[in-house]
């Protein structure tokens, strides 16, 4: 198998010139990052090809050496992707594993690749490229989740359900309106992703260790070759910066919080006590002892992964909070946090998209529950303001008395007699019963962004044009 570790010197071949002996085994273990940063192999090779091409263009290395380097790097890419590459912990990281293998393939020309470059700007480039690509994947995944909610919202724009505050029945809404609330939430997540891509669209390569380089490089050329808008403007900040990683983790934490809230509602709604939805077999599990069980494990695991993603954000914030400018080895701890959060977020979005698409909405159960808990009480208060001319606070008090009477009688507001209501306030007429149904309540909420089916369809159309 191809091996990036054929060098037998006691000290590392890339930086061992001033060392008389190699590192202790414990030092080698704590120092090595190849176990996780090998995930950056494609970005590292892509960056090195762009760098070598620029060096040749500027006459810093020969065209012949550039061609050898590019061919060797392409060979290494094939070896890694086919599983034929042996990663060596002794070589610390992905950069030196690739460079060592390149040297074994093409000889001395490999040593010219690192001209005008440091691992400090190299890793900043690799990691930034990876995060940028992950953000693009996240944007696509969120678009799919938004699309799933738009489909359900369109299907249920007029399906009445109870709206809750404090998890207590509040006012009737439509399931379509509730779905559109999640569209707004995940739409904001997607906007944050897009803004983050703009923020990080600058190429670090060429900043070198921290001071730039005396070689006549063209950083604009490499930036363009790597798909960046422009190069970074300050070499010290370039190698100091992990804002792009922190911003990714912040976005991931907020999105995961939204996913967790959705997961919580799915768990609640799927219980027999609520019965608002029926989960598909594809996103449920059973019990090893209770044959009747159908557990919402996917939703529960998404809810749990939120804590894991939040933990990654806090971990990296803590790593970065006390560092002086330029590179410190502490920053090696950035990647595992981002890689783990990215994997968790990607899986969580996919799981929730599947659950939303496949779940069965039980409109009959939703409608039956919508009228419980005196959910049209606000409609009575509003009617008293409009038709009887009461100030809202007085109408609120009158309605509260009506609710108390209904509780005493064990009935709904709509089941009180006109005489009952007029005993509380004689201005009430029989027209009040027109507003005490859940359908009338929902239909009346025609304010911009409201739950009336016509308004929900406007919200859906607005988002369809942008998804």
Swiss-Prot record:
It comes from the Bacteria. Coiled coil: none annotated. One of its GO terms (biological process) is L-arginine biosynthetic process. Its main location: cytoplasm. GO terms for molecular function: argininosuccinate lyase activity. GO terms for cellular component: cytosol. Its EC number is 4.3.2.1. InterPro entries: Arg_succ_lyase_C, Argininosuccinate_lyase, Fumarase/histidase_N, Fumarate_lyase_CS, Fumarate_lyase_fam, Fumarate_lyase_N, L-Aspartase-like. It is found in: Cytoplasm. It is an enzyme of class 4 (lyase). Keywords: Amino-acid biosynthesis, Arginine biosynthesis, Cytoplasm, Lyase. Pathway: Amino-acid biosynthesis; L-arginine biosynthesis; L-arginine from L-ornithine and carbamoyl phosphate: step 3/3. It catalyses: 2-(N(omega)-L-arginino)succinate = fumarate + L-arginine. The keyword Coiled coil does not apply. Belongs to the lyase 1 family. Argininosuccinate lyase subfamily. PANTHER family: ARGININOSUCCINATE LYASE. NCBIfam families: argH (TIGR00838). This is Argininosuccinate lyase. It comes from Sinorhizobium fredii (strain NBRC 101917 / NGR234).
